[in-house]
Amino acid sequence: MNTRMVNPKKMVFLAVILLLPSFALAQPSNSNWLSQADRAKFDQLRISGSEALYNLDYEGARKIFKEMAIAFPNYPAGPQFLADTLLIEALYQTRRLQASLYNSDSFYNTSDDKPDPKLVDQFRTYTRTARQLVESRLKQYPNDAEALYFFGAIEGLKASFEETVERRHFAALKDGNDAVDKHRDVIKLDPNYRDAEMTIGLYDYTIGALPLAKKIAAGFLGHRGSKKRGIATIERVAREGNWVKEDSKTLLILLYTREKRFAEAATIARDLAAKYPRNYLYKLEMADALVAQAALERESNHVAAPSAAETEAFATFEGLVHDKNLPETTRKALDLIHFKYGEALRTAGLYDRAAKEFVASAQVVGAQEGLATMAHLYAAQALDLGGKRNDALTQYRAVLSRPNVYDAHEQAQTGLKEVYKRKMT
C-alpha cells in the first residue's frame, strides 16, 4: 500500500484509538491453534484481563496476561496483551488516554516530551515475541485467518505506540496501513470475520475524510474510501462483532464527535461509563460530547441559557472533581479532569471559570509535566478571552518557565506579543 498519498496527520490521528484499548482478540475460528479445553481456559483469562484493563486496573491486568503467556507459550495473545497493557498504562500516566486530546495540531509538533527507553524496549520485546509466534504459525498454516488477524492486530498496536508514545508519525502510518492490509486478507479468507472489519472501516473512513484533491490523488493509486461506509462498517462491528465490540464503540465516540454527531457520541460514552464505573475516561468523553452538543444547539437556536446537555456535562465534571469516594485511578487523574473541565467551560464561553480550572490542573500535586504546561497556556488564552490581559501575561510566562511540550513555547511567545483571539471553526 502506498503511504505517501494518505494524509499522515489525519491517518495517525485516527489510528491513535484504533486499538486503544486493544485487548480484543481474534474471534473464534476453525483454527486448531488451541484445543477446545485450552480455549475455554484462555477465554476466562481474556475476559478477566479485559475487565481489569477497561477499569484501568493495570497491575491486575498485567498479572492475568502474564499467567496467560505462561499457560499458552505458543499463542501470541499473552505477549500482545502485555504490550497493550504497557501502552495503555503509559498513556494513562502521561494523560493522553482520551481521544479528544489528539484533536489539535499542537500534538503533531515537536516537543521535549520523550518516552522512557525501558518502556520502549519492553514494548518491542512483547510485540516481537507475539509477531514471531504468528509468523511461525503462518509458516505451517498460511491461510489461518486467526493468525492473520493477530498479525494485523500487532501491527495496529505498534502503530498506536509509535504515534502516541514515540510520536513517530510516518512509522505509525506505515504500520497502520500494514494492519489494514492484513485484515483485508482475513476477510478474503473468511468474509464473515466481523472483527477484522473494524480496522478496514477505520481506513475507509480515513480515506473518505481526506480533502478532495488528496482523495482524488489517492483514488488514482487505488485507495478509495467513504466516511459513510466506514462508519457503517464500524457500527456493524459494534453490533455483531465478537471481541472488539467495545473497541468499536470507543472508536465510534471519536468518529461521531468528528462528524458533529455529539448526541450519539454522548450516548455511547454514557453506556460505557456505566458498564465500567472505574474508568473515568468514558465520563470525560461523555461530558466533552455533551458540551459540544450544547454549543451546537446554542449556535443554531441563538440561545445563551445553559442547555440540559451542558448542565449534565458540568455536573459530571463537578462529580469527578469533588466526589470523595472516587477510585484511586480517577483521583490520580485530577490534573486531566480539571483540564478537561476548563476546556468545557471555555467552549461555553465561561472564560474566568475556565482559567481557574486550567490553573487548578497545573497545581494538582503530581500533575503530569506536559499537561501542566498546556494548562498554563490554556489558562493564559482563557484569561485573554475574558479580558484579563495582565493575568494572561503571568500565565504565558509560566509556560516559558516550564519544559516545552508540543508547540506550547511558541504559542506562549506569541501570546506575550498579542492578545489571544479564539479561532473560528
Regions found by a protein language model. Give the residues of each.
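"A position-specific structural signal for the A-helix of alpha-solenoid helical repeats
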Residues: 47, 81, 88, 150, ...
